[in-house]
Amino acid sequence: MAIYVTLNRILEQRGVTLTELSDRLGMTLANLSILKTNKARAIRFSTLDALCRELDCEPGDLLAYEED
């Protein structure tokens, strides 16, 4: 089982850079980069909520599931 964060796709669709998102959310660029590159082992609901609010999307838009 593999769950992926599709932040890169959403950012491209919205025309937003990771740096802009970092500034808007008050999150570090390093933490957002970890999410964007799928190196995160977990994500807090508060982070998911903030991303959804800022990017005007649903949690399912930011996450994808693929079977191994």
Where are these regions (language model features)?
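Residues within the helices of the helix-turn-helix
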Residues: 8, 19, 49
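Short alpha-helical DNA-recognition segment
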Residues: 16-34
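DNA major-groove recognition helix of helix-turn-helix
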Residues: 36, 47, 66
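The alpha-helix within a helix-turn-helix
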Residues: 11, 22, 52
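Short, basic-rich loop-to-helix N-cap that marks the start of a DNA-contacting helix
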Residues: 39-50
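A short, Lys/Arg-rich alpha-helix, primarily the initiator
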Residues: 1-16
